Amino acid sequence: MKKLIALLLVLATLLGGCGGAAEPATEATTEATTEPTTEPTTEPTTEPAPTYVNPLNGEISEIPYTGRVFATTISNVPAALPHVNAKEADIIMEMFVNSSVVRCIGLFHDISKVDAIGSTRSTRPMFNDIAEHYDAVLSHAGGTNTALVNANEHGITHYNVDSLYRKVDDPLKAGTAYRDKEYKHGEHNLFLSGPGIVAYAQSEGIQTTDLPERDYGLIFAEDGTPINSEAADTIVLQMKYKSTKKETVMEYDAEAGTYTWWQYGEMMADQITEEPETFENVVMMFVPMTTMKHGYHVADFLPGGTGYYACNGRLTPITWTCAGDKEPFRFFTAEGDPLPFGAGKTYIAISSPEGTVEWTAKEPEVPETTEATVPETTAATVPETAETTAP
């Protein structure tokens, strides 16, 4: 019996040792893993390069125009045609200058790129006026004492290249112009050198670059089609002064978006390149005109006036103003809003108020109609139905 009790005590002891003390419960701790936050990175934005508009032709440029406008006289009588590089002018203005003589003045924003221009003729008071309005350096082939005194009185910078080119011992003077006697005879064979006249002007102390930006009166739009306009594929501009008249015709080329210049029954094409003379913008300005005692016509631009404007095959009546002797022409719609021109070259006819403008639209092309052929119909063949016999 004692042995049994002892055995039970041993077993109890062993069982208690196997259980041992209960370990304290440990709560599982989960460390929050924080994802590293990345700051949003913004790509550096590049400011678009500023764009500028050429004030004479509306072309877009990355730099402003700070040059000097140059102007030159261009003969426009039949004996002087065809022109040489008149098509390179940003603006061509045509007018009667005395009696029945019609001439042009061309305005160039960078005449240094044009090797030859002409033929060039003598200046007139109206050319002097226009050069003053645009602060242009005027080149011409002499002029009467009255015209030259008038140019000096206007304070314009002007050069008589007919005199300068003869100074063969002075390369700068001699390089301003040249005569091409194979081209034309007499007074119609003097041609201005664009690079030559710029170099000579610079040698005379005339600043031709890095000038303050200037307002030349024109505004431009990507699409210069005038509002409240009529279709005008053919425009006949008739300049008149008293009993004298001269007709210019502009034919619209819809594919090119330009008007081609016709006069004296011929299309105007360049003597050297044979390319037609074309314009994106066509303008008629009606201006009060009088005649000085020596026979020169003068225009009174300061009151402003009316006219017409055409672009992209459409034409509309306009008004225009000129605020002073040194102010450019400004153009407006008939309602008085600023008139945007289309980017490109501009032709301006200057006429007394007796001048006229007529225009016509092309007849729309009617597509040829072909007789519809009715296809022959064949009668459908009804298949024979197989007789079914009852089994």
Give the residues covered by each predicted segment:
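Ser/Thr/Gly/Pro-rich low-complexity, disordered linker/stalk segments of secreted
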Residues: 29-47, 365-391
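Bacterial lipoprotein signal-peptidase II cleavage site
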Residues: 18-27
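Positively charged n-region of N-terminal signal peptides that target proteins for export
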Residues: 1-9
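Hydrophobic alpha-helical segments, principally membrane-spanning helices and signal/leader peptides
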Residues: 1-2, 297, 377
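A surface/extracellular/periplasmic glyco- and lipid-processing/surface-interacting theme
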Residues: 47-93, 98-367
